Amino acid sequence: MTESTPAVSAPAGGERHASWLELFFDLTAVAGVAQLAHLLHGSPGWDDVALYAVMFLAFWTGWMLFTVYGNVSGDEVRTWTVLAGMFGMAVMAASVHGVREDRAGAFALAYILVRALAGKAWERRGEYVPELPITQLGLGLTPWVVSMWFDGTERYALWALGLLIDLTVMFSVSGTALAARVDARYARKAREAGPGRRAAAKPAAALMDAPHLGERLGLFQLIVLGEAVAQVVAAASQAEWDAALYAVGAGSFLLLLLLWSLSLRHGADGVPLLVWDVLPVRLVLPPHCFVAGAVAALAAGLGDAVEYTHHPVPGPVRWLLCGSLGVYLAVAGVAALCSGRGVPGTLLLVGPSLAVVLVTGAAARQAEGAHLVWLLVAAAAWTRLVVERRRPGRRGRPAQAAA
């Protein structure tokens, strides 16, 4: 990693892989992504997209906190702690369907408890994670607590504020800065305790297992891609099977195949076009979330596109498809820049693809499902072909080489 404070390490006894407990925990991610995608079915408006973005980021944050806890704890992980977090996330997933009616409070309360449980797990271990500053700087949780006394738009705005604070902390507080804060805090406590009194023990900086974390992040992207496949299959099973449906189905499958390749074969940590070890973990996690959220939104759009094999795709669905792929490509472009590809190389990689996506969203008002999907395939295929021709020496984490 690029921070001066050690943040990751390789396992001494050989490479770790996801445990049965971690894979069981990921079942909540399967359920949560499926429920969240349903927020975007039909003809979603901007308010639907905004609510989806906030809830997806909250759900992903809960998953990430316990994923990092399992990564650091290894064989010392407390099973019941993970299962309790799993139950809290299951409540969050179950609350999605009625979030606009009477379940928003349940979603917020479950999120608060999941965050509190994760914080307690680190306190019990006597450790903190330099690359995960929100475990020590929990200001972003305050708006969620306050939201319990509000309803509707005000409540969602408070959720968004809390998540914005967390993102700001992740981007702005380095591992070195967090370590200095912890040292200063416990030095102050020692002075306040006075002579002859025992001060609270300072938590130790925990090291993450980098290859194992890369595998876990990649598995989450596979879960999201799997949800996209499920959406298309479910929609196709209820549609009339004809040439137009075959074109939509084949195009959707090829599009997801291209995204799988860009994220897991030509990326690192599930982030497309990212090279291993160029960014600290705290800067890898947010784009991982953005990519996963974009693919899950794309999944909802692909499921809806199947219904328009003989009619123009409505504007909201068209923009959902184009916008989600646009976000994916934009994150890929940032990752390519951070990976040393340079501005000209990055523009060549994602510039034409983004142009196709934006023009399609703005101009393809009469495009039917098959035409729209295959335009998106062309956009993703360009990036895939260029990256294959300009492949750098190192593509991703060792743990993902077989993906």
Question: What is each model feature region?
Answer:
Residues 27-47:
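Transmembrane helix-boundary motif of multi-pass solute transporters/channels
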Residues 373-374:
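Signature aromatic-anchored transmembrane alpha helix within multi-pass, membrane-resident enzymes
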Residues 2-19, 23, 28, 32, ...:
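Predominantly late transmembrane helices and immediately cytosolic-facing juxtamembrane segments
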Residues 50:
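Short catalytic helix/loop segments, enriched in acidic residues and glycine
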Residues 359-370:
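Membrane-helix boundary connector in multi-pass membrane proteins
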Residues 81:
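Short, flexible active-site-proximal loops enriched in glycine and acidic residues
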